[in-house]
Amino acid sequence: MRSIKAASLTPLLAALFTTLSSTLALPSSVWEHQLETNVLALRDTNNNGSSSTISPSFDVTKCPGYKLVGQPQQSQHGFTAQLSLAGDACNAYGVDIANLTLSVVYEKQHQLHVHIYDTAKQQYQLPNGLIFDRPGDNPADIQNGSTADQSDLVFHHTAENGTQSGNGGWAFWIARKSSGDVIFDTRASNIPTYNDGLSSVSSNTKRNTTAMPAHEMVFENQYLQISSALPTGANIYGLGEYVTGSFRRNPDETLQPFFTLDAGTPVDSNMYGYHPIYTEARRGSDGKLRTHSVHLQNTAGMDVLLRRGVIQYRAIGGTLDFRFFSGDQPASSSSSSSGNDKAVATVKNSPNTAIQQYVNFIGNPVIHPYWSYGFHLCRWGYNNVSETQAVIDAMRQNNIPLEVQWNDIDYLQEFRDFTTDPQRFPQKEFAAMIAKLKDNHQHYIPIIDMAIPKAPTNDTDVYYPGTRGDELDVFIKNRNGSQYIGEVWPGYTNFVDQQAENAGKWWTEAIRNFSEIVDFSGIWLDMNEPSSFVIGNAAGPETNLSNTPAYTAATSVAGWPQGYNNLTWGTSGNITVNGSYTYQQGPVQNNDGSKQRRSLLLSRDEDVLVQRDINVNGGNGDKFGPEDPNYQYANSSQRYLSNPPYAIHNGIHISETPLNVNLDKKTVAMEAVGVDGQRAFYDVHNLDGTLEEQHFYNALRDIRPQERPFLISRSTYPGAGKFTGHWLGDNYALWTILPGEEAYKAGAGMAQSIDGVLQFQIFGIHLIGADICGFNRNSDEELCNRWMMLGAFLPFMRNHNTIGAIAQEPFRWDSVANASRIAINKRYEILPSLYSHMAQSAESGEPAVRALWYEFDEVFEQTKDYAHQFLFGDDLLVSPVLEPNVTQIKALFPNAGGKWRNVFSYEALDVEYNKNVTVDAALSTINVHLRPGKVLLTHSKPAYTVYETAQSPYGLIVNLNDQGEAKQTFYLDDGMTPAPTPNSTLTVSAGNNSVNGSIEGEYKAQQNLTYVVVLDVKQKPTQVMMGGNKTEFSWDQQKTLLNVTGLNADLNGSGRFRGLRLELSLLCED
């Protein structure tokens, strides 16, 4: 090490002494954590060989932007160029990086890559292939890329004519070739500035202001800023994971932090997932609605702000790595020598395509096993095998289908992963329970948390996964080479370095050993943001690591759904008590300004929540670490990791944690490193959960190669859908989020589950659902009734609640039991159609669940702000009840060229289209309608399990449009074989008084077709024939419904089927 000059020694020692004075008063677990940061700063200063340091200015108005240097290097698929600072460094929140490289690559006709990175490549970038593969930055190396002539999108910049144009620094913008409309524009002159911060954000200090006083591009070692102009009232969707009052982001006032956090489901904050992707819908200059997607590839914490006319990115690391997706479909798939003609001749642009193009880039979602679309049941608080078995038995006794039983952390011995409690879940009884489930064609899923208990250091305790992890050297470390220790449910814990050489081997061994004692069908991955209950390293030099007491959760829960007053009506949650309705009376504003009959106000007496995330302490009990450092940079290689100068709004509205522990709260310390001393956790924190999912997916493929892995996980990053499904986290037994400031005291309710499902279609994770009836707080009968109905028409269906809350299994209330039977039976009946949508979306990347305007852009203005209704696939319109004490709802039904049909009664909906209308919605019902011109493939006899249901013959429900036509394709496979999966496509079409079907592919359908229901048959046929033979039928004049029965038709035909195999001739009477 270069020696310190005498002149600089005194101030450096004084700074160190001051730091030690403040830290030595703290436990060793905190001061070691902080001392490492300050020593690192001193070391970097010394290496610079100078006493001169750089202090942040906290002022972006001084930032000069960049200028183009030299001539771009052109190639067939794009170009590269060099950028350098256009003036004196501003060092706003770090050290300005003087030299940057611009890479512009036309990767595909619809996909444009723009990457601005430090030429020295010192900034962290996601290694290619770590989660998903992607083209590189050098256009000369691109294989099978597109060209500027072929591209849907045009890249412009202010120096493209050889000289800098306009005022300010270098900037770029992206335009559509077909219309000339600009979709991304970084020119500061086109972007409004805001000198005041957002009114909704209480803290607007120099370190985290939400003001936007300037828009020059900033590229520093710990702060990157870039802005783009937006139209007034921009229609932005995505940028999550988030909970707010609308699927559409507020274009005038949105602050969205990005940093994976164990936080429940907070309103207007960051939470479990990290997805800096948005889809935007705009009216072009020609008045047409077009949609595109914009993705920023990064791993660092960041804030994204929306204010009127602008979107601004603020990242605390990484690079500016954008991809733009046009949302356009080419006129044909054939190649053309005239690429320009091909690009202009686009025939369609759609949100489905804009989302699909992004999902194709990060990797299409996995096809999940068929059984996973059954009903799942869980709660935190099934304390032993007997309680769990009693619930399984009660479900069957009440004839409520149960496909998958889950256990939360209750089954673990002292909350240690890969163990079972010998008293409460003894292996013999536990194995017998699971075996009985398997014998009945049911399934079992246990939870696994990310934190691994520290291997005991005494001779009386053994924890093999911890010991084996030490042997294979897979656990995250401190900078000094010691193991990093956190605290979670088991006490002292390690965390796996997911990129360690032996990480995959360790996970596979642990999962394989666990599978020999617990015969699970899938795994539930939790706490993998990752979550830790301490700030910093929990173990100091003298900590006794054998003392690992497990945490004890509280057991009392207060809080009820809006309008239910437990002080008046008790804790039953019933709709009626002694003949009286239990909702208190009182007017509350609806979304449309009208008054509803019963109050949505909540009595908040003793509103104490039991959460999976407990209060966070500093190591050994201290709450917070030292105050902010006096930021002094020696050079751009030095960083302040736990407490960078720009404080992203991590956990905003959740707690009043001081900014100096902003990033370390509730997670692994940012200074922790990989097993090789590389990869500061600051850079890889947001990847951790998805890398764990990848390890689990690969392990399950290895352990059970003939089965599809099934994972449900909490923390996600782009590409996670290739490995896992997701549930929307620890939500609340609420109808919707609470009003005003009250919203920040709780979180997502039932209404937000729709927003969440739609979000994750954009994020490429299609198996998605919420905790039905709510996780936090006590639920009640009416909320649970409505939620079970809604949950049956979302991809992932699981009822789950917290320890200490009243029980909410479907059999607990008679009306909920009845609603559950109705909803689950219908789900199982139409499961071939739902599964087809999920499988086809996995193959194509298009969303399985869609906002109405995705399919019907003519209703965009009416539906762009809300998600009160949604489409499952392109054919099932779901309109749930999302408020209490109503028997009617307002809903909008697009004009689809025929009659929408209720899938329960087959009755035609007779309403005015493209307007909000009133429809009946009695308790224990839900409005689900089949689109005209579409077909449902069904199981004819829904049963208790998915397996039993699938043994029954197929049926078809054909809803003719006004032209007497219908068409749909269905995906058939065995529901279990991993990809590449032998499958077939069944195509059903109707027209000219006939219904025809054809099947193509490798998979042979296991069941015959037994009935066909044709809707909108206005006259009674004289005969119905199939294959030249008359068939049985009945006709309902009121419903205009033809029911053809007794078919027993082989969908496969003889051998490999080609052509038409089913034909029903409808010879109608005059």
Swiss-Prot record:
It catalyses: Hydrolysis of terminal, non-reducing (1->4)-linked alpha-D-glucose residues with release of alpha-D-glucose. Glycans are attached at residues 48, 99, 144, 161, 208, 384, 458, 480, 513, 544, 566, 574, 578, 635, 818, 885, 916, 983, 992, 996, 1008, 1029, 1043, 1052. Its EC number is 3.2.1.20. Keywords: Glycoprotein, Glycosidase, Hydrolase, Signal, Zymogen. PROSITE patterns: GLYCOSYL_HYDROL_F31_1, GLYCOSYL_HYDROL_F31_2. GO terms for molecular function: alpha-1,4-glucosidase activity; carbohydrate binding. CDD domains: GH31_MGAM_SI_GAA, GH31_N. The active site is at 526 (nucleophile), 529, 730 (proton donor). This is Alpha-glucosidase.
